């Protein structure tokens, strides 16, 4: 966590995994467009994977809006808001809003990772944000039924 999430949480950085994921998206979209030009590529992520997916997809929009059209839905669970990191990556507010139209976040108010960098109203954050509440109102660090795990919902 320290080497990945903490770096993002403290500095709103463009994380190394997202840079690699962006390269993979570019490559896979090129192949997909050649083999199935009408197909869409859906992206999902949980926890650190939300930061990776969100930054990679947003960077794709920034670099190549035409390739971004191949992205279908981006569905993310229990992840931090990446808005400031996208600004730090050189994206404009207009680009962030446009890229966010395909992104849906499901966040949990009892989960530490879900609430990272969520300091503005949800409508001002990247993507569409839906709040979900765990069945037992558990927190992130509880060993049984952690609110950060999928099975708790």
Residue ranges of each PLM-predicted region?
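Hydrophobic alpha-helical segments
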Residues: 60-63, 92
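The feature captures the conserved acid-bearing segment of alpha/beta-hydrolase catalytic domains
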Residues: 69-153
């Amino acid at each position: 966590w320290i080497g990945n999430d903490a770096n993002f949480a403290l500095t709103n950085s463009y994380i190394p995994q997202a840079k690699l994921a962006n390269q993979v998206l570019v490559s896979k979209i090129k192949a997909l467009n050649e083999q199935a030009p009408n197909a869409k590529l859906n992206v999902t992520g949980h926890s650190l994977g939300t930061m990776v997916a969100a930054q990679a997809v947003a960077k794709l929009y920034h670099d190549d809006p035409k390739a971004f059209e191949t992205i279908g839905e981006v569905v993310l669970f229990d992840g931090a808001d990446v808005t400031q990191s996208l600004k730090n990556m050189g994206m404009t507010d207009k680009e962030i809003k446009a890229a966010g139209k395909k992104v849906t976040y499901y966040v949990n108010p009892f989960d530490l990772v879900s609430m990272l960098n969520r300091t503005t109203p949800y409508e001002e954050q990247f993507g569409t944000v839906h709040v979900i509440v765990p069945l037992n109102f558990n927190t992130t660090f509880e060993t049984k039924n952690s609110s950060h795990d999928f099975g708790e919902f």
